[in-house]
Amino acid sequence: MRTLMIHSDYLRYKTRSKTKIAEDIDDEKRVSGVDEALVAFIAVEKEDEENPELIINKAVKEILNVQNKVNAENIVIYPYAHLSSSLSNPDIAQKILKGIEAELLDNNEAVLRVPFGWYKSFELSCKGHPLSELSRTITTEPEEESEDSEEEPSEPSKMFILEEDGNIFDVEEYNYKNKTLRQLVDHEEGKTKDTGKQPPHVRLMREKELASNEPAADVGHIRWYPKGKLVKDLLSDYVYQLVTQRGAMPVETPVMYDLANPAIREHAEKFGERQYRLKTKHRELMLRFACCFGAFRILADSFLTWKNMPVGIYELSTFSFRFERQGEVVGLKRLRAFTMPDFHSVCLNDDHAREVFANQVDMCAQTETDLDVHYEVAFRVTQDFFDENEDWIKEVVKNNIKKPVLLEVIPKMKHYWNAKVDFAAIDDLGRPIENPTVQMDIQSAKRFGITYLDENEEQQYPTILHCSPTGSIERVICSLLEKTSTDKGNKPSLPLWLAPTQVRIIPVTDNHLDYAKEIYQQIRDSNIRVDIDDTAERVGKKIRNAGKEWIPYTIVVGDNEVENNSISVNRRVDNTKEEISIEDLAEEIHTLTKDMPFRQLPLPYMVSKRVKFD
């Protein structure tokens, strides 16, 4: 169910004509209205048919919760199919809407239910305060009980700020130098408020023709357009380059695993995320949420010795799956299917693991520079690990992270790790986008039977590190798009090496097109992504269109350029214009994109030939 709740001064409606699914109504319901109301526009979805009673109960609870916050005198139930592309059967939709009305009436609320299946004109006045417009997604998933509901309440974590000089402060007493670290702390403490607003990247990913949701698939499954696929592939190439330079060996493993395997089931339960599960005639299977299962199975079947250490296994999981709550799925930030770079390192022991861990934190920190994003960092450890390794933790913050971090000390181990570092960008709404991570795993080697032969030819269980140098590729793109909203004062852009079109050539008229094509070929041969705007638009409109596409360099070709065999380049980053040779332009771009991967433009180079997506 999708709802849009508007706190209004009044709502007035008038029925105009009926559809074939319209309910029968009395004359008094053809024209009506109410003052001082919470108007709940509702679309009942296909998924709601699984459990109408639960949907009714949850919808009523949500409506009453919002009504209580805004102190509305009346409630309006307004059927509004336009909120969803996956509508339920009309009979069930009516049943659910009437059920919501009945339950609200049972709560002694003043309720107006607008007729179902009629074309209507309506007039509404929104009050305009911060809570006057709220959207909600209500699902058939039952509300979860706490993992510790049958146990003693768990002791909460302790939160500190650890600075580079080793000083530790209480999070409430710390003098924050930047707001994003404070925002990370607020989120961890549950203080971040849900504004009901959509993150900017959701609009931008469609507007820039990168990606959009696939309505014919499950929620949280994305379709990628050519520009977005290019950016996604370049990021995948980047991570491959990053990890193989550090000795990782690429592998590929299945996406589906048998939960009858005790090690796989136990690890899945330890991970804690919701999973896609399916049953065949004789098996219960799970779609992987990361590459751990396949990597550990390979390592368990391999002959490892102390001379091999550290052993690195890398896989780009082009499809990882987590069955996130439907209401939590948003844009590229939280998905049910995503692309996860997964790097596992087998280390001799805990001492060796700490050394490799610090190096991998370095690698994760490097991505902050290469991607031109800003990360805040959370260093999470168990109390036992902190007591034994406090000095080492401070060294990592000083030498590898090099800025203040949120230090979370957990009373006891809940998962498979006893230490991990999480890097997170902060979105335009002040919420973290979890990106790179490094985790120290002290359980999986024994669980999966991974051993190595030490110097005395005795079998030992290693310590294993989990590392995703960037986090999911989708979240990287999410972070890049969100940065364009948070980075006030600068023109929005992607890093030059990720820009789908790096240079656009704009001929003034068709008479200049041949020269534009000559320039195009020279630039393309220099391994730079370039295209030509040969559309019938005026030059000013073409330049504005290039700006809307965030193209870093534009070259306008007119009579002067043709006569003098020259080019004049406009740089988006600083709005400068310069007459420059093609060789110097290529050198400038190659210098700015040094060591970054490159792919050619996967689109027609003539803009007039392109398809308009989404």
UniProtKB/Swiss-Prot annotation:
Chain spans, region Editing domain: 1-138
Biased composition (Acidic residues): 141-154
Binding residues for Zn(2+): C292, H344, H466
Keywords assigned: Aminoacyl-tRNA synthetase, ATP-binding, Cytoplasm, Ligase, Metal-binding, Nucleotide-binding, Protein biosynthesis, RNA-binding, tRNA-binding, Zinc
GO molecular function, one term: threonine-tRNA ligase activity
Annotated spans, Disordered: 133-157
Major location category of this protein: cytoplasm
Cofactor dependency: Zn(2+)
Enzyme category, top tier: ligase
Note accompanying the cofactor annotation: Binds 1 zinc ion per subunit.
Region (Catalytic): 200-495
One matching Pfam family: tRNA-synt_2b
Subunit structure: Homodimer.
Main function: Catalyzes the attachment of threonine to tRNA(Thr) in a two-step reaction: L-threonine is first activated by ATP to form Thr-AMP and then transferred to the acceptor end of tRNA(Thr). Also edits incorrectly charged L-seryl-tRNA(Thr).
Record remark on domains: The N-terminal domain is an archaea-specific tRNA-editing domain that hydrolyzes incorrectly charged L-seryl-tRNA(Thr). Catalysis of tRNA editing is performed by the charged tRNA itself.
Family, per entry: Belongs to the class-II aminoacyl-tRNA synthetase family.
Protein name stated in the entry: Threonine--tRNA ligase
